Amino acid sequence: MNDKEYMRLALQLAKKGCGWTSPNPMVGDVVVKEGRIIGQGWHQRYGQAHAERNALASCTEDPQGATLYVTLEPCCHYGKQPPCVDAILDAGIHRVVVGSADPNPLVAGKGIAILRAHGIDVTENVLQEECDALNKVFFHYITTKRPFVSMKYAMTMDGKIATYTGASKWITGEIARNHVQRQRHRFRGIMVGVGTILADDPLLTCRIEGGRDPVRIICDTHLRTPLQSQVVMTAKQVPTILATCCGDPEKQAAYQQAGCRILCLEEHCGHVNLLQLMEQLGQEQIDSILLEGGGTLNWSALESGIVQQVQAYIAPKLFGGRDAKAPIEGAGVPLPDAAFRLKNSRLEQLGKDFLIESEVEYPCLPESWKKSEQ
């Protein structure tokens, strides 16, 4: 096996931490000595041992003189765990092969520099593209302090998310819906508008056995979420945040008694200020959000510049209907040249349905972001 093959194995190990390590990155390691794999590990849970220490602890023989393959630059600072560079030095590792550089300002090349200063041979950027993609959520969060937001919706081939009567169950098949459940496990938060609560009364949990429920975030400008809705009735079991502009303490108290948290935010164009909401959620270490909103919230999110990714699940069906809902509504753009453009698109077939996943490319920094930086 060569460097790339060992790094691919490290990537597969890293993915085992998906959904459990946030706001930390997913990291995998392989220890190789004289052409034999003698140890492997991954970062399993936030707050627990890092991948390097797990891999070294698993070694079946002395790792002195071995090569360590790691998907992300080893850390060199104290956090919930001690620096991984110390463990590498103590183990007598001869060579370290790194996939991604760590953009965390506390690391940012310092880990590699320390290893080289101690005479360790370091090879960088092996399968860098794949390693970077693995931690795109972490890279965004650690550099902006705001959650990575993925706008997710299911629609027909004529662009409808419901029929003209409002019926939407089900647009996609079981395989695609199970894929969505895995996304709910992966993302730290899930966000909808009050319109979705009023129309569908969803539970917004992860239905994968052993999966992690995301923090539920309801954008509800005037606190119209019914106290008998599923999200309120289960708020003591699943963390639930109501983001609102309503400052009425009596209204807020009813939700708080049910177990909901209230975030009272500024109003922006008649709705909750989404940029302010992202800043608050980022401070609470919510590093990623699956946006399952309706057309109004989705447009507001795009207009606010908070969306990094779009996940469109497309079913080979046609609904028609001039009044049938679309995934993105709002004011819209006036001309084709003003469109929000998508890049790095990926297509995946899920049973009879298709997932198109793309990154949002903003032509320039949105005005809302510019104002927030002043």
Label every PLM stretch briefly.
Residues 2-8, 13-17, 22-24, 63, ...:
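Enzymes that bind and transform nitrogen-containing heteroaromatic metabolites
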Residues 8, 12-15, 39, 50-53, ...:
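A broad detector of short, well-ordered amphipathic alpha-helices
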Residues 10-14, 23, 34-41, 130-143, ...:
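A short, flexible N-terminal coil/short beta segment enriched in small residues
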Residues 19-23, 112, 126-154:
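Proteins enriched for Cys/Gly/acidic motifs involved in redox and nucleic-acid/cofactor modification
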Residues 28:
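Helix-turn-helix
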Residues 31-130, 215, 241, 246-248, ...:
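Zn2+-dependent cytidine deaminase-like catalytic core
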Residues 59, 116-117, 142-144, 309, ...:
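Short alpha-helix boundary/capping motifs
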Residues 105-106, 132, 298, 320:
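Generic structural signal for helix capping and beta-alpha/helix-loop junctions
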